[in-house]
Structures are given as C-alpha cells and as structure tokens.
Amino acid sequence: MVDRDIRIAVVGAGVAGLTVAALLRDRGVDCRVFERAPRLVAVGAGIQLSPNGVRVLHGLGLRDSLAATGVRARAIETRSWADGAPIARTPLGDRCEELYGAPYYLIHRADLHRCLTSLLPASAVELGRACARVEERPDAVRLHFTDGTMADADLVIGADGVHSVVRRSVVRDAPRYAGYAVHRGLVPASVVPSFRDDPRVMFWLGPGRHVTYYPVAGGRTVHFSAVGVSPEESPGGGPEDLGAAFGHWHEEVRRVVTSASSVTRWGLYDRDIPDRYATGRVVLLGDAAHPTLPYLSQGANQALEDVTTLVGCLDARPGAPQEAVRQYESLRLPRTAEVHRRARRLAEEFHLPDGPECTDRDQRMRATQDPTHLAWLYGRTAGLPDASDLAPRP
C-alpha cells in the first residue's frame, strides 16, 4: 500500500483530482486538493462514462450513486445529417456489461462532481488556491499560489486541465487550437421523446459539422454538443446561430440545437503527446497530461484510468514515489498516445463532405458496430491496474 507518511498535493478539483484524492485518503495518506475556483462548480454538461471509467467509479463505492443519477445507455446510434439515414448502431446495455463488466452511463457533470465530492471531507479541498508555479527541491516540492502563500509536499499531482500550470514544470509546450468549436446546451427531455424508451447516444455526421446528444439527469434533460469547423477561436454564439448553421439538417437535429434557452461556446484544444508525464516528484493526470479531442468521449474515462494506474504504482512501491511515477508514466504513455491519435483522426472522419470518402467511412462504421470492436478501449488493458485491483471503499 501507499506509504502513509507521504504528503501528496493535488492541483485541480476536477474528475481526476477528486478521484485520486479519494483513493489516496482511503489509504490514510495526507492528501490535499488545491483548487483555483472560489467554489466547486462543475463546468460543462454531459459526460459519457464508458465501462473503463465506470469500473473505477464502482471500485470507489459509487455503484448506487451512478445508477441513481446516470442514464444507462442502450446504444450509440449514428445517422446521416440530412435525411437521418442510419449509418451504424452499437448495442450497449446488457451486452456492454457482459463484455466489459460495467454499463455505459450518461451523466450530468454536476452529478458526477457531487458523487466524487461526497467521498471527501470538506477540509480535503482548499478553494481559491490558484497555483502560480511549482518549485521542485531535492527533498520536496513547493507550490506557490497567486495569493503569495505556499505549500510543500513530497509528491505533486497535476490535475489542472488542458491549461495546466503544473505541466509547465514537466513539459514546455502550449495548447493547440484544433480548428473546431463546440456549442453545448441542455434541452427538456420532451424534445427527444424516443429517449424515454430507448436511451442512447445520438451522433449525426455531416460536412464540416457533427452533433451529439443524449439524456442526462436521470432522463429529465438532454445534453447536446454541436461541433463545427472554426478557423478562429472566437467567443459567443447562441441558439440563433445554431439555427442558421444547422438549417438544412434533419428536423430532429434542428429541434434539439434550437431548443436550449442558452448555449456555451468553447474552442477545442489538445496538445501533442509529450515524451514524459512526470519529472522527479511531479506527475500529471488527465487533461493536464494528455488533453485529447472529444471524438472518442474519453476525457474523463482516460483520467480515471490514469488515477487507478498511478495509485496502483504507488501501492506497489511504498516509500519510493519517484519510482512509482516512472512506472505510471511508462504504462500510461503508450495507451493515452493511441487514444489521442485515434481521436485526432476522427476529427477529420466525422466532418467529411458528402462523396466517396464519406461513403467509405460509413461502410467502415457499419463493419465495426459490434461492441466487441471496442475491446481495445473499454476492456481491461494488459499491465494496467483496474478498479478491482484496488482496495474497495466500504
């Protein structure tokens, strides 16, 4: 088990930061989370939790909480933008659990955040502590905060997202704008009545754009994201802009994207995969390590894999955190690089113009719609600790 005398500081109270803190504190470790925001507010709306991520959350004791707040997806269904012609349907539901040992959940980010914060005492998360820089010393790491305060730790875990401050002490690079922007919103469940009997993820693919939507909040609300090519990362945009952008799309898509009372617009960023995720006593998790485009819906799920791998490595090397993070790095770099590479490729495939390339893509999707083709992503990965390898939370 992890050395209980080690002091661990986590920067960032997102999915990765809260989860790793919960696992470490379960082991009696002095672990504190430093979050720049003055209060915990979950940014965003829907999250797709695939079995590789759900297994981790089940291992934390959140099985009942996920079942109560999430929506168990029956399928991922892909259709063509204009006429709604079916392209592929990947069955999930019971089949997913049979293959991968956990369901596929659709959940509101705020609900997931509440599940994770319930695992920690309020004193474990220090709010309003914005990290300005990381100073690595021979015997410790010192965090410097923007308010002039400092904190020392034996190990610092950077879980502070795509614009990570902690990452600067490990890798010198910058986020890359991917050339796409996403509009996100929430609409009433009545907008997509078919979700009542067939809760699923809907993908609509078209030239230069795609739309995803699915039920969240126990089926009471539908989350959508509408992605389009955008050469410049400009702010703003509302439902009226979406109505114009998707004016020639299928009626259901138009109804979804124009039914929100408000939408948010975000540029999509990633970074190249570096040659390391750690240096000495500093290690990166989640988007701080490998920010990835969202086309595989793996942001939170890969972060959860990071957490179980890191904690498993710390368990295996008590008293030697630097060796543990080197092992974590060697295990996670190849895996996350493959997910990252495939996500970038899908950025092109999802937005092809109508024509021969689009037809070929649709045929490939039909040929791989059986969920067994997702074993590389959703199944247990050789050499990586999984939730069942970690002591369960009572």
Curated annotation (Swiss-Prot):
GO terms for molecular function: FAD binding; monooxygenase activity. Its EC number is 1.14.13.249. Keywords: Antibiotic biosynthesis, FAD, Flavoprotein, Monooxygenase, NADP, Oxidoreductase. One of its GO terms (biological process) is antibiotic biosynthetic process. It is an enzyme of class 1 (oxidoreductase). The active site is at Y214 (proton acceptor). FAD binds at A16, R109, D287. Binds 1 FAD molecule per subunit. Pathway: Antibiotic biosynthesis. It catalyses: 3-amino-4-hydroxybenzoate + NADPH + O2 + H(+) = 3-amino-2,4-dihydroxybenzoate + NADP(+) + H2O. Its cofactor is FAD. Belongs to the 6-hydroxynicotinate 3-monooxygenase family. Part of a gene cluster involved in the biosynthesis of cremeomycin, a light-sensitive o-diazoquinone with antibacterial and antiproliferative effects. Catalyzes the hydroxylation of 3-amino-4-hydroxybenzoate (3,4-AHBA) to 3-amino-2,4-dihydroxybenzoate (3,2,4-ADHBA). This is 3-amino-4-hydroxybenzoate 2-monooxygenase. The gene is creL.
